[in-house]
């Protein structure tokens, strides 16, 4: 086998490990909302409104864990390397899922939720997003959007799995599953080589030249006609908040919206959540081809995502017909959850070149704000107006966020010619 082929195979396994970790994350993202009734019953709460508010608060603590950890994680991932952070994230996942299995009060579950958020963003996002981009730098956008594919596949499977094992005497199977997968992730992260770590080791052995990562950053800066302005810096970070705000709202509350606002049963709500995820999986492969093979500009993809997400959310709010909502939720999955968050990270790196761990940490910090803020206000609104009104109001907030994201994309598209000398319609190199 040629050296080039060996290198490709070597870091192909790194991508497989990244995707396995995010396949498991697909459960972490959904476990509280999908098992809502069984969780708050285990905590000793009998009132459904109070129970729903408590679960939303646990989800908020999960987001808070993301918020406080990811920026620091990104900085240390660049300094320490990808493997140590990936391994630490897997260990933390095993601990937090085990806590969720055994705790019998909401406060302790908030601790577990916080830990799971910190494990996801502070360790895995900080290490594995850069690792996906570094495995094959030319196809960084496709590598990163593949993360969304891994999450989305589990997003289809897990709600249906939960519906099958929702009975009180067997529902803990829904927690055993991520514990087993987390152990598998631990094994894979231990044995996986990562390009960034190998380059650091090579440099430490005496290579005094600029490493590939620094050379890539400098080349990107040199290719720009001028430095990005303050609004470009701010908008590319706020995009993370907006993408996460929309995606997290639909991901966490689609099932509850279907049951509370459309009158669906448990299986119908799970099916609605799965349709949302099917839309996202379809989009992942579609956009991977558009950006990987056809070399579409990631910002062009993001602009289209926001335009159609706005349309889908408007349909959900204006046409409360079950069939129409199913179609709209599928569209929302395709355009809002089909890699928009991951594509936004690539846009950030393109417009504001810098160390990938640092850029990932900054971007994911704003993502963490969205993941914290949304469930917190849903919890407060549920206590104030009941679940039905809270979820409808939340959909209105998602629509407003989508419109703002669309305006941000239009501004960045107008800046493309000034920064790069070409429009977003030109194929990427």
Q: Language-model features: where?
A:
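Helix-loop-helix hairpin linking two adjacent transmembrane segments in secondary transporters
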Residues: 139, 143-197
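Extracytoplasmic gate region of multi-pass secondary transporters
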Residues: 32-33, 229-277, 281
């Amino acid at each position: 086998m040629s050296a080039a082929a060996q290198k490709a195979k070597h870091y192909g396994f790194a991508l497989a490990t990244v995707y396995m970790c995010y396949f498991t994350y697909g459960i972490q993202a959904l476990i509280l909302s999908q098992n809502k009734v069984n969780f708050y019953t285990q905590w000793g709460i009998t009132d459904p409104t109070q129970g729903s508010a408590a679960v939303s608060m646990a989800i908020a603590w999960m987001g808070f864990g993301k918020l406080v950890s990811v920026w620091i994680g990104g900085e240390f991932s660049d300094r320490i390397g990808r493997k140590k952070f990936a391994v630490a994230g897997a260990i933390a996942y095993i601990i937090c899922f085990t806590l969720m299995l055994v705790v019998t009060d909401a406060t302790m579950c908030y601790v577990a939720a916080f830990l799971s958020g910190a494990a996801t963003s502070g360790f895995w996002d900080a290490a594995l997003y850069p690792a996906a981009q570094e495995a094959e730098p030319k196809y960084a956008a496709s590598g990163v959007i593949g993360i969304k594919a891994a999450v989305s596949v589990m997003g289809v499977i897990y709600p249906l799995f939960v519906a099958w094992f929702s009975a009180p005497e067997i529902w803990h199977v829904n927690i055993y599953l991520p514990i087993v997968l987390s152990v598998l992730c631990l094994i894979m992260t231990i044995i996986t080589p990562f390009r960034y770590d190998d380059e650091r080791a090579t440099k430490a052995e005496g290579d005094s030249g600029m490493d590939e990562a620094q050379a890539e950053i400098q080349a990107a800066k040199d290719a720009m006609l001028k430095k990005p302005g303050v609004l470009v810096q701010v908008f590319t970070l706020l995009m993370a908040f907006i993408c996460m705000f929309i995606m997290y709202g639909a991901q966490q509350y689609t099932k509850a919206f279907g049951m509370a606002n459309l009158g669906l049963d448990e299986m119908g709500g799970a099916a609605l959540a799965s349709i949302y995820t099917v839309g996202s999986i379809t989009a992942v492969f579609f956009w991977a081809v558009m950006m990987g093979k056809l070399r579409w500009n990631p910002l062009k993809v993001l602009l289209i995502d926001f335009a159609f997400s706005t349309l889908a959310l408007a349909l959900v709010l204006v046409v409360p017909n079950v069939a129409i909502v199913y179609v709209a939720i599928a569209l929302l999955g395709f355009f809002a959850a089909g890699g928009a968050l991951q594509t936004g990270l690539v846009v950030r790196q393109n417009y504001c070149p810098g160390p990938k761990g640092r850029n990932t940490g900054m971007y994911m910090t704003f993502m963490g704000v969205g993941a914290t803020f949304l469930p917190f206000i849903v919890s407060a609104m549920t206590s104030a107006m009941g679940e039905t009104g809270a979820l409808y109001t939340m959909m209105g907030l998602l629509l407003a966020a989508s419109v703002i994201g669309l305006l941000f994309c239009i501004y960045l598209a107008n800046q493309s010619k000034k920064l790069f000398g070409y429009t977003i319609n030109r194929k990427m190199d």
